[in-house]
Amino acid sequence: MTVAITDVVLRDAHQSLFATRLRLDDMLPVAAQLDDVGYRSLECWGGATFDACIRFLGEDPWVRLRELKKAMPKTPLQMLLRGQNLLGYRHYADDVVERFVERAVKNGMDVFRVFDAMNDPRNMQAALQAVRRHGAHAQGTLSYTTSPAHTLQTWLDLTEQLLETGVDSVAIKDMSGILTPHAAFELVSEIKKRYDVTLHLHCHATTGMAEMALLKAIEAGVDGVDTAISSMSATYGHPATEALVATLAGTPYDTGLDIHKLESIAAYFREVRKKYHAFEGQLKGTDSRILVAQVPGGMLTNLEGQLKQQSAAHRLDEVLAEIPRVREDLGFIPLVTPTSQIVGTQAVLNVLTGERYKTIAKETAGILKGEYGRTPAPVNAALQARVLDGADPVTCRPADLLKPELAQLEADVRRQAQEKGITLAENAIDDVLTVALFPQPGLKFLENRHNPAAFEPVPQAEAAQPVAKAEKPAASGVYTVEVEGKAFVVKVSDGGDVSQLTAAAPAPAPAPAPASAPAAAAPAGAGTPVTAPLAGTIWKVLASEGQTVAAGEVLLILEAMKMETEIRAAQAGTVRGIAVKAGDAVAVGDTLMTLA
């Protein structure tokens, strides 16, 4: 049985290795070679690529898809879709899901790997059915995790539910690299024994088990696996394509791929990758912490960067210890986008505020309320009661509570475009969907579509070279520097040599800084200061000057780590000295306002 290979070099590889920064201009020169390999498919879209395109790169993701399809007409293109969340961080009404899938197919997408962070099949149903209606390949997904609530029967039941919904294949998505070789063999064997289904396996290499898991799954009968070209593999990423091709050559599982063609592609990316050095994580080998904390590799990179931005890098071990506790409180949910961000951010809040759940992120409350779907196990009853505040939890498919919203979204985007003098794309619906998924970054992108200066500068090859010694000696130390909304951790040695340069986790791009002093320097007035628990961007200021507020009332909403955190009044009082406005970037401890 020939094993099919999906290469993830154009999507998950660079998402895992250097924060989704690979640009279209670095993809197109090698596209013809990739198209000539004979892959089952090439993953090139979805996941975080859509967000990164409009937030950091100034690229239109729809144009990227069309250009890749034009450059690789022979190989099916594949994307990762978050079910009812599409590519955003909330549930969308069914009419938005339908239209997004339709436009993705029209622009060139062939294979949709559809997953749900809760493993709730109801949240995958609309997307999977839309994919099949529009003639593309619908792949349902098991987001693999382990917990007291997850057994072999859990995965067999979910497979059956996906087959009942209607899928063309099923993928096992091991986003944390915690699938052991023997568990892989058992899981694949039992699924293939019971169901007539094409089965695919996706593993991350972070713990060092992925290659063994793939091989045991192949022996058990898996039909296809994900790999990444060698120069874009390993650490936070995936097993190397060439290694698996060589391993299976001459066996009944021979992939039929030409390793010489693969080496040529690897050589290309070996050089291209140097340009993105500043965005790479610090992992050089494997990371056993993930086996204990069950944290996906990409999430670990983000946590390291986020804590540096919060001036709390030394508290990583405390956060790693807190993550399993938060996950249990939230019903042992899998740690995959967006739940990995939700659990990680809540763990950071619990540690940095010094009190568990002193601040509950909006998204954490959403899981407790049932707004994200059914959790694998019951959530913490006391926490749920606290956020429900007497209301009933959501028990139906969450999207059933959403009215059709596409018409209103389209009207809103067209109105904003007219007000701001924005020329929409020829197929305006694509721009509408971009803003629907990412309201603030999407609108900023449309305003600056032809203004590269509004986004991150294009990385240059020389950025990976050693920095020349400064003429004037500089003090040694480790500094965090922010450039275009991106935090970099720079280690300067005696004499001014930059001996280490790493990128912290992506932060939401803040609005252009005002000419006035930063928030921390603004007059706060007399009274008890309300301070920022995290570094981030002010999303909304809800309180007004002179307003009387009760203890627990929401004063502001802070966007940090791609999540909204409500800042509440610790006591009753009168709002004085509001020091921030929407769009302001704030640091940990900045005074936002005072309560007199």
Curated annotation (Swiss-Prot):
Q: Which residues carry this modification: N6-biotinyllysine?
A: 562
The segment annotated Disordered runs over 503-526
The chain positions of domain Pyruvate carboxyltransferase read: 3-263
Q: Which UniProt keywords apply?
A: Biotin, Ion transport, Sodium, Sodium transport, Translocase, Transport
Q: Which InterPro entries match?
A: Aldolase_TIM, Biotin_BS, Biotin_lipoyl, Carboxylase_cons_dom, OadA, PCB-like, PYR_CT, Single_hybrid_motif
Looking up Gene3D superfamilies in the UniProt record yields: 2.40.50.100, Aldolase class I
Report one GO cellular component: cytoplasm
**Catalytic activity annotated for this protein?**
oxaloacetate + 2 Na(+)(in) + H(+) = pyruvate + 2 Na(+)(out) + CO2
Gene Ontology MF terms: decarboxylation-driven active transmembrane transporter activity; oxaloacetate decarboxylase activity; pyruvate carboxylase activity
* EC number(s) per entry: 7.2.4.2
What cofactor does this one take? biotin
Q: So which domain of life are we looking at?
A: Bacteria
What residue spans carry the Low complexity bias annotation? 516-526
Start and end of every Biotinyl-binding domain? 523-596
Which biological process terms from the Gene Ontology are attached to this UniProt entry? gluconeogenesis; sodium ion transport
Tell me how this protein assembles: Composed of three chains (alpha, beta, and gamma).
What the protein does?
Answer: Catalyzes the decarboxylation of oxaloacetate coupled to Na(+) translocation.
Q: Which protein is depicted?
A: Oxaloacetate decarboxylase alpha chain
